[in-house]
């Protein structure tokens, strides 16, 4: 492992870390160690790293903002590639933009507000990066990535390929981004709007999100997808589960579709709590809730 880390270190400008606790990099503050943790500063470093990892047969996962993911307590036996270095962002005069996969969604929205570009303002306050937002077709209110996405640049061991939006097949919290590919950038299109109107709206959206979801404890956002014609939080509420806990994991008192780390929670606590919620909701309503959170790593 030290030899591989040294070889990766020759590629990267940032340090390669061994045994890095992933709890430091996830919004739940949960997760065991990564065998190797690396942070490419650009697409060239990323592709070179993927090529080397493929040569040695090392499994890997990408990690952006660390939201919408649960890392198991045993950590990840392989490489974790942090995409925070992919920060390029460029706009043209026609309201189109190319945005790096590591750019936080909120940072993009702020730039759009300054330029009077509308299309993602409903996502204000969403704790995600553009790369992760493309992979899961992140959405809020009446908007999602699919509404502004022209295409995405996907990196693999052999280089970067552009996929147009129709090939990405964005649906409700899903896309066709395949395993073994990382979103390095997204090509987006926006419509013109008043910067002043956008600024007011975005401020209101952030305030609304904080009021409705400001749980004050580590969490990963919404845990379950909304079933067709239903809202997951209402189904959970119908079972009177706010405050229900397993170990250090607890259904938020503020928002029923959030699970919070109330202190010392382990991934196993969260998984057991998810299973309990599913069982109780199915028993009461007949509906099986589908998790929105991706689970990675070993128990």
From Swiss-Prot:
Keyword Amino-acid biosynthesis listed: no
Pathway assigned to this chain's UniProt record: Cell wall biogenesis; peptidoglycan biosynthesis
Active site location: 173, 222, 292
Key words, A-Z: Cell cycle, Cell division, Cell shape, Cell wall biogenesis/degradation, Cytoplasm, FAD, Flavoprotein, NADP, Oxidoreductase, Peptidoglycan synthesis
EC class name: oxidoreductase
Localization (cell): Cytoplasm
Reaction catalyzed: UDP-N-acetyl-alpha-D-muramate + NADP(+) = UDP-N-acetyl-3-O-(1-carboxyvinyl)-alpha-D-glucosamine + NADPH + H(+)
Pfam families named in the record: FAD_binding_4, MurB_C
GO cellular component: cytosol
InterPro entries from the UniProt entry: FAD-bd_PCMH, FAD-bd_PCMH-like_sf, FAD-bd_PCMH_sub1, FAD-bd_PCMH_sub2, MurB, MurB_C, MurB_C_sf, Oxid_FAD_bind_N
E.C. numbers: 1.3.1.98
MF-aspect GO terms: FAD binding; UDP-N-acetylmuramate dehydrogenase activity
Domain FAD-binding PCMH-type: 29-193
Cofactors (names): FAD
Origin: domain of life: Bacteria
Swiss-Prot/TrEMBL GO biological process terms: cell division; cell wall organization; peptidoglycan biosynthetic process; regulation of cell shape
Role played: Cell wall formation.
The family this protein is said to belong to: Belongs to the MurB family.
Protein name: UDP-N-acetylenolpyruvoylglucosamine reductase
